[in-house]
Amino acid sequence: VGNTTAATGKGFAIASAALTSLALFAAYVTFTGIDGINIFKAPVLAMLFVGGMIPVVFSALAMNAVGRAAMEMVQEVRRQFKEISGIMEGTAKPEYDKCVDISTKASLKQMMLPGLLTIGLPLLIAFLPLVFGMDQMIIAEMLGGYMAGVTVSGVLWAIFQNNAGGAWDNAKKSFEAGVEINGEMTYKGSDA
């Protein structure tokens, strides 16, 4: 029930995010009054590609952030095992509060760049062309192209990552139970 519920929940979350993105896009088009996005204009096409790239870049930055935060946690746990005798035997209590503190601080610190990217890039697209004297309608189309790229790429990337995560989870469970590879049973902790 747990995996099925999680998989169903992820599907609903992806569908909800896709519909929300489309609703925001429709609201943007209505608010700006643009009647279409002409991708034959080079700046608009460029922003479409930039938008398509953002979910991938954000995901890479977020995964790196998780890895760095996890390494900080591993170092703290190793320190506690070295310095506090009796943790492994269950006679001494670990310093849970330090682990929670590291987790909180590291997650906030490491997610600054992805957060700034998602907030700053649309603002940059909106205001930087004004410095160069571009027409406001072309800027509106550029932002629309950016939003379209983010929406399409983001939905596809979410589906891909959901499926990849499910495959990794199933592979992990298979190895925990034992998998036959080339006639040999392979278990968790083996070279496979």
Predicted regions and their residues:
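Hydrophobic packing and interface segments
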Residues: V1-A192
